[in-house]
């Protein structure tokens, strides 16, 4: 056990985690040169296309150190985006140390800090690494000072490397072996294994990634899931050297995969503890804190026949993604679907794309909303995650919206722009600290503003230099209203949105104008209205298509023309009474883009 090292690689987006993993795999000979490709651990094609890591991946390698010993390295490559930070915290729970990768050109950014604090809270040894020293803009001296100044760990002798060219990666490994402590645990004690992650394989059933804390797990053992008390047979187990390799046993301190032929997707929840059926452990291992979704949206299959397939797909996906929340929902406009909870907009996009690709579904998404806390006049408190669940205006005593605490790091030059943006988003400044030429800003901004497009706008006002990390702080009373959209006098539940009263007039008008362009013209007038309660705040009309009934009249008497026009008018009126309006998918997406074009 003294030769095992478990560690994660944590860093801000694009600071070179996955590339560093590639080099480590190459040096330790996990894959032959022929099998090697860039970002070998980003196995999902979605990850490769966007150039981001979504799922944490684990690898077990053997490394022959300069002291002559061979060490077993179990390492986990983690995502950098704030939406996937739960992946990072889960990975860290399986480790004793973490490599904090910092780009020697960009310096410390918000995610660097957030991930580093997560690691420190779990009492992990954090080893700083300065990456990308081959860049002309690299300034390792300044960045080392920044790490000390902002993060507060000693970085004077931080390893310097370039993962792209491979310079200094050997030193990273030596430092790892030296600084990160070996796992603790009792190899002879009763088995305790933590489920770090799981996914569904169509042939094998549920595959779990586990970390053995105490005891040993052998092939053929009967294992028991501690939370449900279910027992299963350990059919196959092994490690990833990125490839799946079978082993006969997993020893104390190791990280590996396990297949128990579990068909039920809720059979082995992530964060649970496995133990042996014949010699069970007393205590459950501390799991992970449940992450609360921050953004909710309705997902509906385009054709209602896909509902069953959609339900199964969500089940399989939620096994792989513990933070996905879903419950059935029906809408008069869109039929049956699910209300899903996500950690952020990127997470929502990724889930939707994975459902469409991996499970071949066509989906419609409604506008994302956050959770509001509503105190009704009868003094009960309810949580509302969709505009249609909001009680009538006269039944609401107080409506509270979630406030996010946003930590931003940015160069001083962009401070003015960023403050303007935060104020526009109804933010309140709580803290501001200067570190060299970097500024650390803390704002409290309503969650609804943060999840919509705050991140994109922050990046564009600061030319990509500002970085953001946010977390939920509290609920705060606020003057929010629900804007309904009426089409020919009928409410369309899927188009409603909750917004601040000050913005409601503008949001309503923009939405109505946008819908006008998107709804195709029909044989009768379509009135599109935005309303708060019964009060109409905006309206526009999609004009009807009409035939020129006077074309055959040539000269003709005025009364003849009037008769024809009157007849047409009556026909249109009858049509309007029975006519239905088809809404295209773009109309539902219009809500997302309200307020984007006029900036």
From Swiss-Prot:
<dbReference type="InterPro" id="IPR000795">
    <property type="entry name" value="T_Tr_GTP-bd_dom"/>
</dbReference>
<dbReference type="InterPro" id="IPR035654">
    <property type="entry name" value="LepA_IV"/>
</dbReference>
<feature type="domain" description="tr-type G">
    <location>
        <begin position="2"/>
        <end position="184"/>
    </location>
</feature>
<dbReference type="Pfam" id="PF06421">
    <property type="entry name" value="LepA_C"/>
</dbReference>
<dbReference type="InterPro" id="IPR027417">
    <property type="entry name" value="P-loop_NTPase"/>
</dbReference>
<dbReference type="InterPro" id="IPR035647">
    <property type="entry name" value="EFG_III/V"/>
</dbReference>
<dbReference type="GO" id="GO:0005886">
    <property type="term" value="C:plasma membrane"/>
</dbReference>
<keyword id="KW-1003">Cell membrane</keyword>
<dbReference type="InterPro" id="IPR004161">
    <property type="entry name" value="EFTu-like_2"/>
</dbReference>
<dbReference type="Pfam" id="PF00009">
    <property type="entry name" value="GTP_EFTU"/>
</dbReference>
<protein>
    <recommendedName>
        <fullName>Elongation factor 4</fullName>
        <ecNumber>3.6.5.n1</ecNumber>
    </recommendedName>
</protein>
<dbReference type="GO" id="GO:0003746">
    <property type="term" value="F:translation elongation factor activity"/>
</dbReference>
<keyword id="KW-0648">Protein biosynthesis</keyword>
<dbReference type="InterPro" id="IPR038363">
    <property type="entry name" value="LepA_C_sf"/>
</dbReference>
<feature type="binding site">
    <location>
        <begin position="131"/>
        <end position="134"/>
    </location>
    <ligand>
        <name>GTP</name>
    </ligand>
</feature>
<dbReference type="InterPro" id="IPR000640">
    <property type="entry name" value="EFG_V-like"/>
</dbReference>
<keyword id="KW-0997">Cell inner membrane</keyword>
<dbReference type="GO" id="GO:0005525">
    <property type="term" value="F:GTP binding"/>
</dbReference>
<keyword id="KW-0472">Membrane</keyword>
<dbReference type="GO" id="GO:0043022">
    <property type="term" value="F:ribosome binding"/>
</dbReference>
<dbReference type="InterPro" id="IPR005225">
    <property type="entry name" value="Small_GTP-bd"/>
</dbReference>
<dbReference type="Pfam" id="PF00679">
    <property type="entry name" value="EFG_C"/>
</dbReference>
<comment type="similarity">
    <text>Belongs to the TRAFAC class translation factor GTPase superfamily. Classic translation factor GTPase family. LepA subfamily.</text>
</comment>
<keyword id="KW-0547">Nucleotide-binding</keyword>
<keyword id="KW-0342">GTP-binding</keyword>
<dbReference type="InterPro" id="IPR013842">
    <property type="entry name" value="LepA_CTD"/>
</dbReference>
<keyword id="KW-0378">Hydrolase</keyword>
<feature type="binding site">
    <location>
        <begin position="14"/>
        <end position="19"/>
    </location>
    <ligand>
        <name>GTP</name>
    </ligand>
</feature>
<dbReference type="GO" id="GO:0045727">
    <property type="term" value="P:positive regulation of translation"/>
</dbReference>
<dbReference type="InterPro" id="IPR006297">
    <property type="entry name" value="EF-4"/>
</dbReference>
<dbReference type="GO" id="GO:0003924">
    <property type="term" value="F:GTPase activity"/>
</dbReference>
<dbReference type="GO" id="GO:0097216">
    <property type="term" value="F:guanosine tetraphosphate binding"/>
</dbReference>
<dbReference type="InterPro" id="IPR031157">
    <property type="entry name" value="G_TR_CS"/>
</dbReference>
<comment type="function">
    <text>Required for accurate and efficient protein synthesis under certain stress conditions. May act as a fidelity factor of the translation reaction, by catalyzing a one-codon backward translocation of tRNAs on improperly translocated ribosomes. Back-translocation proceeds from a post-translocation (POST) complex to a pre-translocation (PRE) complex, thus giving elongation factor G a second chance to translocate the tRNAs correctly. Binds to ribosomes in a GTP-dependent manner.</text>
</comment>
<dbReference type="Pfam" id="PF03144">
    <property type="entry name" value="GTP_EFTU_D2"/>
</dbReference>
